[in-house]
Amino acid sequence: MSPEPYLGEVARTPVRHHILSVLVENKAGVLARIAGLFARRGFNIYSLAVAPAESHARFSRVTIVVDAESAPLEQIVQQLDKLVNVVAIKDLAPRDAVERELLLATLPLDYKHRPAMIDTITLAGASIVDVGPTSVTVMLAGTPEACDELERALEVFTKVELHRTGRVALPRLG
């Protein structure tokens, strides 16, 4: 009997996060200073993503997601603002932001469970991006909740490997 595709609801546990979009000078050591600041204060970084900002090699945008209970927003912003290479800080409230993550998973090619696997992948809005002789790689670019749901749905299949990026976010336009 093949595993059934997971069609359940996303668990909506009220986890509160602060999403900070931090514009920094693109210089060596800046990320280490930011991470060090969080470590010294005992703030846990839930998610972290860094990339060059808006095609300017001089700046990078750091998206940091922290647990609201462990890290008071005002204190984080004040401490970040003291760092020399920090140019700007935006607090993106989850309701006012568009958030995305990337999930990549390698699954064994199991022809017996192939239909259920394809149904699960398709229903999640994911796609197969690579096929090898014994495994496939699945990708989903979606909300953190969609990535959580796909990760849970793939639990019925043996995973060779699973990776998720840090969250990225932009303010909503309207």
Predicted regions and their residues:
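Long, contiguous binding/interaction regions
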Residues: 1-60, 65-174
